[in-house]
């Protein structure tokens, strides 16, 4: 065998021979097998080192520990603030939409009522059955609203109002009677037609009662002539 000048040339020759035999036998060269096994071992060792590095926990500082403890609370407060603001905004939007809907509804009713009112003033016979029903319903609703506002819900106030009403009626009733009595009790003026008629009636009653003997004249005894009565005067009157 030929001598090799160096180990490198010897190794190169061995590789060449191995490749030739590998081509003939269709096998992998020894160098490649050794290299693959070495590569596998290196990769396995590297993977193991990486796993060890990952599995070993790194020590945390006090600031990191405190931040980890406070992190859930901070997230919860942020979430609550967001939800609170969003709920407030939603409520405001809902109120605005509801108000706008009510205003639109009132405006539509006003337009409808104005059209029907105009039709009633110009041509009432042109009103349809639905419009007549609408007017009846509107009138009934307004009457109920007035009755509701005029009614007193408080029982004490209603009772007090009824008592005041009764007192006023009692005060008014005697005044009317006293006025009539005063009118009847006031004597008529002298010289008036009423006074003359009253005097004639009184004189007639007096004479009638005197003739029947129900009353007596002043200075007379029942059944006797007056004290100053003179028979001669009566005879003279008869002779005349």
UniProtKB/Swiss-Prot annotation:
Keyword field: Nucleus, Transcription, Transcription regulation
Annotated InterPro entries: Rrt14
One Pfam family, short name: RRT14
Biased composition (Acidic residues): 228-240
UniProt superkingdom: Eukaryota
Compartment list: Nucleus, Nucleolus
Protein's name in the database: Regulator of rDNA transcription 14
Organism from which the protein derives: Lodderomyces elongisporus (strain ATCC 11503 / CBS 2605 / JCM 1781 / NBRC 1676 / NRRL YB-4239) (Yeast)
């Amino acid at each position: 065998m030929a001598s090799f000048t160096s180990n490198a040339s010897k190794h190169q020759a061995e590789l060449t021979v191995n490749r030739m035999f590998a081509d003939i036998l269709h096998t992998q060269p020894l160098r490649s097998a050794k290299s693959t096994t070495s590569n596998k071992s290196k990769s396995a060792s590297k993977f193991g080192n990486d796993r060890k590095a990952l599995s070993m926990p790194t020590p945390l500082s006090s600031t990191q520990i405190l931040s980890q403890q406070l992190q859930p609370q901070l997230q919860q407060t942020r979430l609550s603030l967001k939800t609170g603001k969003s709920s407030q905004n939603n409520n405001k939007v809902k109120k605005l939409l509801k108000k706008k809907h009510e205003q639109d509804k009132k405006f539509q009713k006003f337009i409808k009522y104005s059209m029907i009112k105009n039709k009633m003033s110009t041509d009432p016979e042109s009103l349809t059955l639905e419009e007549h029903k609408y007017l009846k319903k509107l009138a009934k609703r307004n009457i109920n609203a007035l009755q509701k506002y005029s009614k007193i819900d408080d029982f004490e106030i209603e009772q007090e109002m009824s008592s005041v009403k009764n007192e006023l009626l009692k005060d008014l009733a005697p005044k009317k009677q006293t006025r009539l009595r005063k009118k009847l009790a006031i004597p008529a003026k002298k010289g008036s037609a009423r006074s003359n008629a009253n005097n004639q009636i009184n004189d007639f009653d007096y004479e009638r009662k005197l003739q029947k003997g129900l009353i007596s004249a002043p200075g007379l005894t029942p059944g006797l002539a007056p004290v100053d009565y003179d028979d001669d005067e009566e005879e003279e009157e008869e002779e005349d």
